[in-house]
Swiss-Prot record:
Domain of life: Archaea
GO MF annotation terms: RNA binding; structural constituent of ribosome
SUPFAM superfamilies per record: Ribosomal protein L30p/L7e
Pfam family, one: Ribosomal_L30
Entry-linked CDD domains: Ribosomal_L7_archeal_euk
Keywords (A to Z) from UniProt: Ribonucleoprotein, Ribosomal protein
Matching PANTHER family: 60S RIBOSOMAL PROTEIN L7 (PTHR11524), LARGE RIBOSOMAL SUBUNIT PROTEIN UL30 (PTHR11524:SF16)
GO CC terms: cytosolic large ribosomal subunit
Protein name from the UniProt record: Large ribosomal subunit protein uL30
An example Gene Ontology biological process: translation
UniProt subunit comment: Part of the 50S ribosomal subunit.
NCBIfam families: PRK06049.1 (NF004711), uL30_arch (TIGR01309)
Length: 162
């Protein structure tokens, strides 16, 4: 049995659009809160999510997110469900977290999950990457494209999209 600390936190970024997507893939993307192109989400790499990620690998890219990238993502692109952006002041007055750093640490240690927090949107709306994609967006990462598993390289892509 694998402990919760050993399960990595995975960032998934949708790269391809909504046209001509098979219904089962579209539904899986909706369950992952990836309804539009360039939206990102964070999930733990459990068996359930592994199957979902495998199903949407031809429409997204994913990898292990690190602390500084997660912190920048929450600061720049974190949105509240009632409107507005995520801030230290709002967190300290309305939640158990005193800062965005504390929230990022809780997400990385899997004490809380992004989709289970009722006050933050479970996705991040990103820009297209600065400088464009360096590889084709219709081929897998291992074949010289942008799709699928890319490991720690997801952090450089997300930083270019924030």
């Amino acid at each position: 049995m694998v402990s919760l600390e050993e399960i990595p936190l995975i960032a998934i970024v949708r790269i391809r659009g909504r046209v001509n997507v098979k219904p089962e893939i579209r539904r899986t993307l909706e369950m992952l809160h990836l309804n539009r192109k360039f939206w990102a989400t964070l999930v733990p790499l459990t068996d359930s999510y592994k199957g979902m990620i495998h199903r949407v690998k031809d429409y997204s890219t994913y990898g292990e997110i690190d602390g500084p990238t997660l912190l920048a993502l929450l600061r720049e692109r974190g949105e509240l469900k009632m409107g507005g952006s995520l801030s230290d002041e709002w967190l300290s007055s309305n939640t158990d977290f005193s800062s965005i750093e504390e929230l990022a640490e809780a997400l990385l240690s899997k004490r809380v999950y992004l989709h289970k927090l009722g006050w933050i949107k479970p996705y991040f709306r990103l820009h297209p990457p600065k400088g464009g994609f360096k590889r084709p967006t219709k081929r897998a990462w291992n074949d010289g494209g942008e799709l699928g598993y890319r490991g720690k390289e997801i952090n450089t892509l997300i930083r270019r999209m924030i």
